[in-house]
Amino acid sequence: MTTTTAEGGGGVAPFVAKTYRMVDDPATDGVIAWGRDSNSFVVADPFAFSQTLLPAHFKHSNFSSFVRQLNTYGFRKVDPDRWEFAHVSFLRGQTHLLRRIVRRSSGGGGAKRKEEAGGCGGGGEAAAGDVDEESAVVALEVARLRREQREIEGRVAAMWRRVQETERRPKQMLAFLVKVVGDPQVLRRLVDRDNTNAAASNADDSAVHHQVKRPRLLLDSSSTTTTHGDRHLVTAAADGFYAGGCGPEAAAAAAFVPDDAVDFTGLYTGGDGFGNAVVDAGVDYPPAYAFPVVDSGY
């Protein structure tokens, strides 16, 4: 096979022009774009490329056919691990060089055909290269399809688990309703259990509240008194508190005097509380104070 070039005159091949427009379009950089050195192009997403760009520019959506056409126009694959192709006349911004990229074709003469068939066997090597290129394309497509199949199977399995869970809940509800119909006491026991738990919780809260509540100072009938002359001294109450206060100081200082014996100013009135008191009219000093004086530090 021989490669013909059109350095003078002639236009750009439609396939080359369309390929250049796809590569040079910034809107499609996620699918097809220029290489790092701008002397090659990379098909980043062959699946999206075959589904969107190929039908828009060509009459097919076969990525393998696109690769075969690239090989026919002299493009070569640069990186074996990705779809990167290059041509000496396919450069970014150098559109005037595109006319040099022409389709490779065999000569019309018999001599040329014999020469191509004999010699070094260049035609056979080119055909073998085409077959290898197509085999590589098919292998990559198969690998991609297997990967997509695994992803789809994973999504289907997840959906199936959700469906099973959705079906299990109505079955559980139906089983519960059947149980309630067969034994109406089941629902009552559940309600009673909830009420019991709520009451226990309220009781615990009430107990905590009473623990922090301050005790009331009460003097009940269990208090004991002792008589010291004409006074009745409250010594203790059953709950440990004393009249007028609490603690040993209040127990030592508090004295009870009947209301009918002493008025509100503390003066003796002659009531029953001090019936044995002797009043000396000839003494010119006031009678003894009815309440004991306790040394309080003043």
From Swiss-Prot:
Region Hydrophobic repeat HR-A/B: start-end pairs: 145-181
SMART domains the record matches: HSF
Motif placement: Nuclear localization signal: 213-216
PTM statement from Swiss-Prot or TrEMBL: Exhibits temperature-dependent phosphorylation.
A Gene Ontology term for the protein's cellular component: nucleus
Region (Disordered): 105-128
Swiss-Prot/TrEMBL GO biological process terms: cellular response to heat; regulation of transcription by RNA polymerase II
Cell compartment(s), UniProt: Nucleus
Protein's UniProt keywords contain Phosphoprotein: yes
Quaternary state and interactors: Homotrimer.
Note on domains (UniProt): The hydrophobic-rich region (HR-A/B) corresponds to the oligomerization domain.
Summary of the function given for this chain in its UniProt record: Transcriptional regulator that specifically binds DNA of heat shock promoter elements (HSE).
Family of this protein: Belongs to the HSF family. Class C subfamily.
Protein name: Heat stress transcription factor C-2a
Source organism (scientific name): Oryza sativa subsp. japonica (Rice)
Gene of this entry: HSFC2A
